[in-house]
């Protein structure tokens, strides 16, 4: 194993009461590498990703990004993000508010949040006037692009 892989997991264990969902997982992902996690339902794929983005805490082991531990860093400060299978958008909010949400958590100024949201609308080929459109009024494909824009908003180092 290289000394400073992009992402390294050392001895990751995740337990839920008496149930061990992940048992001593070691993994190394290099810069620029694409990595796929496959397995049957209930095998721990989602649990692993939830640990990587900080939605759950590891029971044991460590997660390192470029050699620095991130498993004790709060989720809103980690340089990782995920697009949920269900998209997990806020239907009562506008497209712009959804995209800006992770930036608001990071205390980015309103002007900078708006500028980044508009930049991402352009990148993902959604009309700029969608900024004020309710997510509930978007098509399924448009919602997927909004979820991707939200995940890219703070320019994460790793996207799941």
Ranges and model annotations:
Residues 69, 111-129:
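Conserved ABC ATPase "signature" region
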Residues 134-138, 142:
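Conserved ABC ATPase signature
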Residues 148:
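Hydrophobic anchor residue at the start of the ABC signature
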Residues 96-104, 114, 118:
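Short helical segment in ABC ATPase nucleotide-binding domains corresponding to the A-loop/adjacent helical element
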Residues 38-40:
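The feature captures the beta-strand-to-loop junction immediately N-terminal to the Walker
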Residues 53:
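Helix-to-loop junction immediately C-terminal to a conserved catalytic motif
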Residues 155:
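Conserved catalytic motifs of ABC-family nucleotide-binding domains
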């Amino acid at each position: 194993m290289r000394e400073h892989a992009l992402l390294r997991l050392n001895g990751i264990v995740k337990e839920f009461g008496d149930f061990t969902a992940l048992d001593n997982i070691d993994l190394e992902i290099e810069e620029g590498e694409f990595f796929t996690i496959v397995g049957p339902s209930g095998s721990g794929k989602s649990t692993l990703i939830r640990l990587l983005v900080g939605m759950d805490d590891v029971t044991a082991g460590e997660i390192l990004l470029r050699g620095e531990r991130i498993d004790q860093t709060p989720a809103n400060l980690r340089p990782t993000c995920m697009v949920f299978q269900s998209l997990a958008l806020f239907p009562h909010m506008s497209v712009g508010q959804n995209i800006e949400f992770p930036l608001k958590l990071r205390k980015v100024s309103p002007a900078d949040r708006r500028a980044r949201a508009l930049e991402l609308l352009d990148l993902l080929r959604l009309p700029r006037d969608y900024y004020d459109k309710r997510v509930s009024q978007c098509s399924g494909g448009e919602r997927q692009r909004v979820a991707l824009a939200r995940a890219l908003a703070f320019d994460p180092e790793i996207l799941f």
